[in-house]
Amino acid sequence: MIVKAWFTTLNFAPESWNMPKKTKFFILPLILLLAACSGAENKSESTPENSAPAVPPPANIGYTVVNIYPHDTSAFTQGLVYRNNQLYEGTGLYNESSLRRVDLKSGNVQKETDLDTSLFGEGITILHDTIYQLTWKEHVAIAYSLKDFKELKRFNWSNEGWGITNNGTDLIISDGSDKIYFVRPSDFKLLRVLSVYDNLGPMDALNELEWINGSIYANRWERDYIVKIDPESGRIIGRMEFKDALQTYAHYSPAEQARVQEDGAFLNGIAWDSTSQRLFVTGKLWPKLLEVKLNN
């Protein structure tokens, strides 16, 4: 069709050309080439100029491990919070779930309350003077007094409970999907939902959460890294690698690391000290808790 249009525009057709065959042999390819270029130009002009740009991959977040502390190897860590020079930890598993206050340097439990045996404890966060703890599949969230761990109230949460943090106003919850939920703390009313993604697409299995300097940090279930999430767009803008942390910092052999990970001993604890700008990282059943200084 393009070639025919060109012939019409030029007002001549091949059968009417009065020239030597050899000349026709060179002219016809030239016209076909010009027609092809014209078609490509038209196609380019019809392409939307406002197509979505490619999503850049997450930037590497460098860090330095500045201290290593002991951690209870029986603690199936599901949540970790640092507040007023105290470390708080939520642990999981049926018949074993608890809420604890832990001495940072020794790893000793200073105060503890056990959950009902029918509840599987999950993430924790502290907002003002209240500790909030999720449960896994029981659709129950529990509020405690920070001072004495006295239970204050229970809330219904319609999804699974995995990780929880807060931005000073709202509770922020994960449920193992690629979604993060902003929730009103007074009644657990859902305020908004954030879809999390990186350059490869949606990222699911988001677990433990921590609010750090205006961003959401999350570890991914049974993975050895932490991602930094923009709380407005949901885009993953940074990533911290903790590959083979048990070998590096707890001196496990590769076989020992593989064995304990079969029992669930994966990275799953993030706590931020906003005063000293330091991060604490541990995992389920880990023997060590790391104090980390972010490099950027």
Task: State what each model feature region is.
Residues 52-73, 104-108, 252:
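A short helix->beta-strand "capping" segment at the edge of beta-propeller domains
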Residues 73-84, 117-127, 157-168, 200-214, ...:
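Beta-rich, blade/repeat-based domains predominating
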Residues 38-41:
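Bacterial signal peptide processing site
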Residues 103-107, 145-149, 185-188, 230-234, ...:
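Short loop/turn segments that connect beta-strands within beta-propeller blades
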Residues 89-93, 132-138, 173-177, 218-222, ...:
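Conserved beta-strand positions in repeat-built beta-propeller and related beta-rich domains
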Residues 66-98, 114, 118-125, 283-285:
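Beta-strand-rich domains and repeat architectures in extracellular enzymes and scaffolds
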Residues 34-36:
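C-terminal motif of bacterial Sec signal peptides marking the signal peptidase cleavage site
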Residues 143-199:
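Hydrophobic, well-structured mid-protein blocks that either form specific transmembrane helices
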